[in-house]
Amino acid sequence: MIDFFRSAIAAALASAQLNTAKPIQLEQPADKKFGDFSTNIAMLAAKECGKKPRDLAQEIINHLAFPPDTVAKIEIAGAGFINFYLTPRFIMRSVEQVLRDGEKFGQSTEGNGKKAIVEYVSANPTGPLTIGRGRGGVVGDCIANLLATQGYEVTREYYFNDAGRQMQILGASVRFRYLELCGNTIEFPEDHYQGDYIRDIAATLYEQHGNALEKSEELEPFKKAAEELIFKSIKATLERLNIRHDSFFNEHKLYLANNNSPSANTAVIQSLSSSNFIDDYDGATWFLTTKLGQEKDKVLIKSTGEPSYRLPDIAYHVNKFQRGFDLMVNVFGADHIDEYPDVLEALKILGYDTTKVHVAINQFVTTTVNGQTVKMSTRKGNADLLDDLIADVGADATRLFFITRSKDSHLNFDVELAKRQSKENPVFYLQYAHARICSLLRLAKQEVGFDADTYGFADVLQVLDGAAEVQLGFALLNFPAMIQSSLRLLEPQKMVEYLHALAEHFHRFYQESPILKAEPEVRTARLLLSVATRQVLRNGFTILGISAPEAM
């Protein structure tokens, strides 16, 4: 709908021979007394067009052309806002588009021919997934779903490192537990991985090999077994949460030279050095970020010879550019806040278009269980595990609760609320709206022979003009714009808020508008409005990755 009015305003400007490069922005005023839509284009373009804002607004209005029964009135407000008030007939006629498009309603071709990559979860295989990683997984999965609705060819990638110091500690942790099973008394190091999963991996090795590995000083068999079993566990956990990946990228690839070419990490150092942004001092290799106005330079290679996180991250992004992606989205935890700006600066120096790179930082999660907050730690036996949460509250509640708050905000996950069967529970409230519509349609088929799958809808909805009906219809039409807004902000929470408001509109409509007992013409229109609402709820649930139950 927004595109319809944007095109009409652009046509009015052209008809009035008013040329402007300013974008035509349309917003929905919070207060309906200012209209259904409002634009500030007259204020933005006034100077460029050589006119006062209110005079330009009037000239635009004079050249606007709409089909009959589209706009009830147009007003100029304040310094030059143009406010549009739509007719109920236009709104309800537009709802027919929902019924025509079905599951494709809200989709666009904006991303057709473009490749996007979304990197999310990306936990190293050192232990089961924690709840914090789960939040990033859901945020990333929803962003990938949003991109897919806009026509992008989306690659969902998991980036990991199986060669770092933590993996060595993992191997040693398993070896110590294995030696205990062989009858040895071991003083287990405090800084090693302590969870029960380490004992489980050691037990698996003992079942397979008995005491055969007892004398081995090599960590590799222990590390390899741990990596394989933990990755299997991680993938199973993600599958329970309806999260999938198309590609798993091993950081180790960035360390490998190929056909007389340097490794990706070395190539980054060489390129930054040729641009005079590398120096060696204090035994380390530094990225000279002080030349970019920062207080300190940043280490790329430590004095031990190990790279810092920044170097492979830069090389990894170079690899993404080399793979031809038009859009790159990285879903990071809050621990990356200080790092990623340096990665972007390095990419700029290397000549890459960093406007293609978008970063979504999601804050930490704590869970409240029986009034007690449990902290997460992969290395502790009391780790707050994602699997445990899914088993306790279910996949739908887990997914939705992760995105009920902005990704930028710390999330307190109320486990008791997530299990509550009441309207205070957002997942129950949304799914109940869908189930309620399904129940209504089943009853309509039994009592009046209405079949939502076969009923024609042309020019039927226009008989509806009640306040609750029109508000619901208008809310339905906002779905495509909400997809675009959620994607632009990389904020799935906006979609949750929209769907919650839509459910509220439906419940109000259901209470205020008799359906099955209405006159046949009105009854049919109200049933079709319910069908359209069910469709938009389903489409939204698909983006959020939750189920759409037909009965509750």
Curated annotation (Swiss-Prot):
GO terms for biological process: arginyl-tRNA aminoacylation. SUPFAM superfamilies: Anticodon-binding domain of a subclass of class I aminoacyl-tRNA synthetases, Arginyl-tRNA synthetase (ArgRS), N-terminal 'additional' domain, Nucleotidylyl transferase. A motif ('HIGH' region) lies at residues 123-133. It catalyses: tRNA(Arg) + L-arginine + ATP = L-arginyl-tRNA(Arg) + AMP + diphosphate. It comes from the Bacteria. GO terms for molecular function: arginine-tRNA ligase activity; ATP binding. It is found in: Cytoplasm. Its EC number is 6.1.1.19. Keywords: Aminoacyl-tRNA synthetase, ATP-binding, Cytoplasm, Ligase, Nucleotide-binding, Protein biosynthesis. GO terms for cellular component: cytoplasm. The keyword ATP-binding applies. It holds the Pfam family tRNA-synt_1d. It is an enzyme of class 6 (ligase). Belongs to the class-I aminoacyl-tRNA synthetase family. Monomer. NCBIfam families: argS. This is Arginine--tRNA ligase. It comes from Chlorobium chlorochromatii (strain CaD3). The gene is argS.
